[in-house]
């Protein structure tokens, strides 16, 4: 995925856009980025400090079972205009000769998904434990939630010491965030297409 991100950065810069990668491959192999994303040089902090308008997070999806066909999934913020997310999904499907994901859970449109935190009463999940004031309709995915400030319900204030502090959680200047699942690594069809047609995927985005 890092190669994809570098390719996308180059394409966007060729269009005159300014792009910052929050991960460039220089990170230590044994570095657990889950627990340092809010550090001074962490991914969330870098994104928030960049002054960017938008954050795109590229991912390869997976599940427990090998599947024949996976497909593209674009995750967006709840209560937002999904026009851009729909455009991303359509472009990738058409230009990269892939398909929309068949997953129905969290689906808002073909290839477009909105997942929110479903907070249990006992706060047993690790990333909500000991926090108060978290409501169900905020984004589940941290890269969307924690880069959007007040607008997306960013809440990581150090209550759970394992995850640090998001110094931008109360910012009224947030980034518009999307997580792009290019396909499923446990689908041979998806994986081969991504490896063979990486340029088409990035051109679509």
Predicted ranges, named:
Residues 3-205:
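Active-site-proximal helix/loop segments of hydrolytic enzymes
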